[in-house]
């Protein structure tokens, strides 16, 4: 499963829409909820990011992200 994680680079400031960034994670999970929990844990253990939202990508959404040219799976 591929998840898109929306985040702010620091927890010190209030979140601003203009500075929201995203990364993609491939997570092995039995269901969507378990995948979101694992994705959050991976990001929190390896970064100081302020996580805003974690989204499971559907096949169509994943194809769109790949075509946009910015798709790259992050590995920790």
UniProtKB/Swiss-Prot annotation:
Its EC number is 2.7.7.6. Coiled coil: none annotated. Keywords: DNA-directed RNA polymerase, Nucleotidyltransferase, Transcription, Transferase. It holds the Pfam family RpoY. It catalyses: RNA(n) + a ribonucleoside 5'-triphosphate = RNA(n+1) + diphosphate. GO terms for molecular function: DNA binding; DNA-directed RNA polymerase activity. It is an enzyme of class 2 (transferase). GO terms for cellular component: DNA-directed RNA polymerase complex. GO terms for biological process: DNA-templated transcription. Belongs to the RNA polymerase subunit epsilon family. A non-essential component of RNA polymerase (RNAP). RNAP is composed of a core of 2 alpha, a beta and a beta' subunit. The core is associated with a delta subunit, and at least one of epsilon or omega. When a sigma factor is associated with the core the holoenzyme is formed, which can initiate transcription. This is DNA-directed RNA polymerase subunit epsilon. It comes from Streptococcus gordonii (strain Challis / ATCC 35105 / BCRC 15272 / CH1 / DL1 / V288). The lineage of its organism: Bacteria, Bacillati, Bacillota, Bacilli, Lactobacillales. The gene is rpoY.
């Amino acid at each position: 499963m591929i998840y898109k994680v929306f985040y702010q680079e620091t927890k010190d400031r209030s979140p601003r829409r203009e500075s929201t960034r995203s990364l993609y994670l491939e997570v092995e999970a039995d269901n969507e909820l378990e995948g979101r929990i694992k994705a959050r844990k991976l990001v929190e253990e390896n970064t100081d990011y302020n996580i805003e939202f974690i989204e499971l990508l559907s096949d169509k959404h994943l194809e769109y992200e790949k075509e946009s040219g910015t798709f790259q799976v992050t590995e920790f």
